[in-house]
Amino acid sequence: MTRNKPRTPATSDRPSAKSPSRQRFSKNVKVSLGLVVIAAVVLIGLFVLGGGTASAPPGERADMLVRPDSQRLQVAEDGKVTFVEFLDFECEACRAAYPGIEELRRLYEGRVTFVVRNFPLHNNSVAAASAAEAAAAQGKFEDMYHRLFETQTEWGEQEASQEDVFFGFAEELGLDMDAFRQVYDDPATAALIQRDQADGRALGVTGTPTFFLNGDKVDVSGFQELIDLVDAALAA
């Protein structure tokens, strides 16, 4: 086969144009690199938000669901059935679920353990959770729990801090205010709330309220369906 002799290119002040194949190659490399970067960002986001850690081993799941210092609204002596709620005191959906949870507690008093975990998502929900934990240190968690939900329409969805409101609740409950302030401001209280959030994310919690019954996430469409699940757990 005869090869054509290379030609000496003519002198020109203009840069030589890239061939179409080289242009396509360069474009494809850029697109591929872009997709790699996007995929990395998405994966990092999943782990940061907790989506990548939803499947914790069974033993770890049990520890994450209920910690020794988790707040218990009521405790069943046999410990057979445990109902856990990850909540946000400022969450409107949590407020809407509150009467149903109270009815559930009434129906299963002494037979089901009810546990509350913090999962704050709103402007003042960390402060509200801190107030509840500070009240718990004086044996008044349930009282503050009720007060926060029953008055949520008054302080919720506010841009400004509602700390004074929460301290007012503490005074109304007759708490030692110096002791309340100490626990409220304690870094250990903030760490407890952050750990609740981390546990929730590891368990697949992405919003509130999220319920677990004996370790299984509850997904029901109505109150009767929830009652049926609790009855089945008690009968098992």
Where are these regions (language model features)?
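C-terminal cap of thioredoxin/glutaredoxin-like
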Residues: 2-46, 171-236
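A generic local structural motif
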Residues: 67-72, 100-102, 196-199
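A short beta-strand-turn-helix
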Residues: 63-81, 106
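Short secondary-structure boundary/capping elements
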Residues: 64-66, 96, 192
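Short, flexible loop segments at the rims of nucleotide/cofactor-binding pockets, characterized by
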Residues: 62, 92, 189
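C-terminal region of N-terminal signal peptides and the immediate post-cleavage residues
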Residues: 43-62
